[in-house]
Curated annotation (Swiss-Prot):
It comes from the Bacteria. It is found in: Cytoplasm, Nucleoid. Keywords: Cytoplasm, DNA-binding, Repeat, Transcription, Transcription regulation. Its main location: cytoplasm. The keyword Zinc does not apply. Residues 7-54, 83-126 form the SpoVT-AbrB domain. The lineage of its organism: Bacteria, Pseudomonadati, Pseudomonadota, Alphaproteobacteria, Rickettsiales. One of its GO terms (biological process) is negative regulation of DNA-templated transcription initiation. Pfam families: MraZ (PF02381). One of its GO terms (molecular function) is transcription cis-regulatory region binding. SUPFAM superfamilies: AbrB/MazE/MraZ-like. This is Transcriptional regulator MraZ. It comes from Rickettsia peacockii (strain Rustic).
Length: 149
């Protein structure tokens, strides 16, 4: 399967290393880079994570915007300018940069959340708060999904 699914909570050690769930690594197995691209989410206080192929799609999307627009500049700065390549070690761990950990409020635990073509890394309690709000929105907007095709 080529989508990121499910939710996992893993510990973060004193060196800021965290194990990426094995099934997430399996999805990334087809990528040219043995690791992930991570950047601060522009929607939530979390880290968005993807493979090189998704970053290329984001690049193509930003290139459709006016090259001198504030929007394009902001998106490119926040996504590409803040993105970091994180390589997997022999145990499937990555080292989370302090800037990303601070953005997400991550200290001792990280919550991995599959979102289809990307996954997010949250501070677990912050994700639970978000999940409660998301459940309400999903319930209220459920017909939108049915009408999407």
């Amino acid at each position: 399967m080529n989508v990121f699914l499910s939710k996992y909570v893993n510990g973060v050690d004193k060196k800021s290393r965290v194990s990426v769930p094995a099934n997430y690594r399996a999805v990334l197995g087809k990528e040219l880079f043995n690791g992930v691209i991570a950047y601060p989410s522009i929607r939530n206080n979390c880290i968005e994570v993807c493979g090189i192929s998704h970053i290329e799609k984001l690049r193509q999307m930003t290139e459709t915007l006016d090259p001198y627009s504030e929007e394009r500049d902001a998106f490119e700065t926040m996504i590409f300018g803040e993105a970091v390549q994180l390589s997997f070690d022999g145990e499937g761990r990555v080292i989370l940069p302090q800037s990303l950990m601070k953005h997400a409020g991550i200290e001792e635990q990280a919550c991995f959340v599959g979102k289809g073509v990307i996954f997010e890394i949250w501070q677990p309690q912050n994700f639970e708060k978000y999940l409660n709000a998301a459940q309400k929105i999903a319930h209220e907007k459920r017909l939108t999904l049915r009408n999407a095709h």
